[in-house]
């Protein structure tokens, strides 16, 4: 995955799918996902031609040593009505992305390697464009940062920024394994206030909003407690993605847990939020790989930070520099602290 837009050796025609209009201006619009009893529709349009420069950005972080209190997490400037509206748009984005992804899953299509040799497909590109079109039509003052095309905003910064990863786990998508997902985050003044993990093949959608309990297909969920590392189930996508130094740190945790597991991409975090695993530890993630996970994990009662225990914020600007980050997510603050102590990352 890349932190900024790149040119591909092959071009695709990007035409978002046609669908009914999203009633985004109506505050009473329900926030249920398409996988519960009510389906959200979304605005359709052809791909919008917006000049995209190679923008870069950075992350800053704030320390956190306590389990998040979901009753006090919403920014005071943001009303419940606004948050509900943004959640409705987020669900519409996931619907649009999922419609594209299901069209191409386990089908034959061209695969292009990016500059870092990570793969991209027409499904990645079309899914991102479908989401971008909805945001531009419903929330034109918001900025967008997508994995495939980077920063999209006429301004150099914005209070609201949507961070999109149309297919987190493209290799799993290519090989027909449904553990990939669409990641959608909304940041307000640098803080993730809304996050969605959508698995369009299994039709599972996790949505987290600061100040509210995380839901899976409309039902409240929560993480589980684990008293010590020796009883923990741990996920990471692949140990081959770690640098030598990071792999040594990871191995100190791996050697203490009950069961180390591999290969789930963003789905591992969804399983953690639902109370099926205890830890997820990964290295070298870009902002679009994990910002959507923050409200989902925290709203389910878990903790997610970098390897030093600092919480994630994104201070967006057109001239910021992108870097990679190490992420540890846990079902509760106790097992999270034990993982940090074992990582010994300074």
Swiss-Prot record:
It catalyses: a myo-inositol phosphate + H2O = myo-inositol + phosphate; L-histidinol phosphate + H2O = L-histidinol + phosphate; beta-L-galactose 1-phosphate + H2O = L-galactose + phosphate. Keywords: Amino-acid biosynthesis, Chloroplast, Histidine biosynthesis, Hydrolase, Magnesium, Metal-binding, Plastid, Transit peptide. Pathway: Amino-acid biosynthesis; L-histidine biosynthesis; L-histidine from 5-phospho-alpha-D-ribose 1-diphosphate: step 8/9; Polyol metabolism; myo-inositol biosynthesis; myo-inositol from D-glucose 6-phosphate: step 2/2. GO terms for molecular function: histidinol-phosphatase activity; inositol monophosphate phosphatase activity; L-galactose-1-phosphate phosphatase activity; metal ion binding. Disruption phenotype: Embryo lethality. Mg(2+) 2 binds at residues 165, 168, 289. Substrate binds at residues 147, 167-170, 263-265, 282, 289. Mg(2+) 1 binds at residues 147, 165. GO terms for cellular component: chloroplast. Its EC number is 3.1.3.15, 3.1.3.25, 3.1.3.93. Ubiquitous. High expression in roots. Expressed in pistil and seed endosperm. Changing residue 195 to R: Loss of histidinol-phosphatase activity. Gene3D superfamilies: 3.40.190.80, Fructose-1,6-Bisphosphatase, subunit A, domain 1 (3.30.540.10). GO terms for biological process: inositol biosynthetic process; L-histidine biosynthetic process. SUPFAM superfamilies: Carbohydrate phosphatase. Transmembrane segments: none annotated. Residues 1-61 form a transit peptide. InterPro entries: His_9_proposed (IPR011809), Inositol_monoP_metal-BS (IPR020583), Inositol_monoP_superfamily (IPR051090), Inositol_monophosphatase-like (IPR000760). It comes from the Eukaryota. It is found in: Plastid, Chloroplast. Phosphatase required for histidine production. Also acts on L-galactose 1-phosphate (L-Gal 1-P), D-myoinositol 3-phosphate (D-Ins 3-P) and D-myoinositol 1-phosphate (D-Ins 1-P). Belongs to the inositol monophosphatase superfamily. No redundancy with IMPL1 or VTC4. This is Bifunctional phosphatase IMPL2, chloroplastic.
